[in-house]
Amino acid sequence: MFLLYEYDIFWAFLIISSLIPILAFLISGILAPISKGPEKLSSYESGIEPMGDAWLQFRIRYYMFALVFVVFDVETVFLYPWAMSFDVLGVSVFIEALIFVLILIVGLVYAWRKGALEWS
């Protein structure tokens, strides 16, 4: 028998955790002073008069490093629970995790061969 009342705490937490930021934005939008002028449209430079354009063009290698970092950061998120329950799960899950790591190693070798990890 599926009992929905067991999830009451979850739904209460979800509603409260959604309402707090929404209310914070609404209250600050209502109570905050609105002033329009040229100072509001300029970029803030720690009290120094801004010089030049605020838009900078980043080189693509920053994005490649960030992408490789995110891939291996997500790998850590997936492998940590597996490592904590390794003795309970058995050999089949070990083989699946090994395949997962091998696929990531292939991706790392591909990025390395394409020059995504070179900083020159």
UniProtKB/Swiss-Prot annotation:
Keyword field contains Hydrolase: no
Main location: plastid
Catalytic activity entry: a plastoquinone + NADH + (n+1) H(+)(in) = a plastoquinol + NAD(+) + n H(+)(out); a plastoquinone + NADPH + (n+1) H(+)(in) = a plastoquinol + NADP(+) + n H(+)(out)
Name of the molecule in the record: NAD(P)H-quinone oxidoreductase subunit 3, chloroplastic
Coiled-coil segments: none
Topology with respect to the bilayer: Multi-pass membrane protein
Subcellular location: Plastid, Chloroplast thylakoid membrane
Catalytic activity, EC: 7.1.1.-
Gene3D superfamilies: NADH:ubiquinone/plastoquinone oxidoreductase, chain 3 (1.20.58.1610)
GO cellular component, one term: NADH dehydrogenase complex
Function: NDH shuttles electrons from NAD(P)H:plastoquinone, via FMN and iron-sulfur (Fe-S) centers, to quinones in the photosynthetic chain and possibly in a chloroplast respiratory chain. The immediate electron acceptor for the enzyme in this species is believed to be plastoquinone. Couples the redox reaction to proton translocation, and thus conserves the redox energy in a proton gradient.
Keyword line: Chloroplast, Membrane, NAD, NADP, Plastid, Plastoquinone, Quinone, Thylakoid, Translocase, Transmembrane, Transmembrane helix, Transport
Swiss-Prot/TrEMBL GO biological process terms: photosynthesis, light reaction
Oligomeric form and interacting partners: NDH is composed of at least 16 different subunits, 5 of which are encoded in the nucleus.
Similarity section: Belongs to the complex I subunit 3 family.
Keyword Transmembrane helix: yes
Positions of transmembrane segments: 9-29, 64-84, 88-108
Gene Ontology terms for molecular function: NADH dehydrogenase (ubiquinone) activity; quinone binding
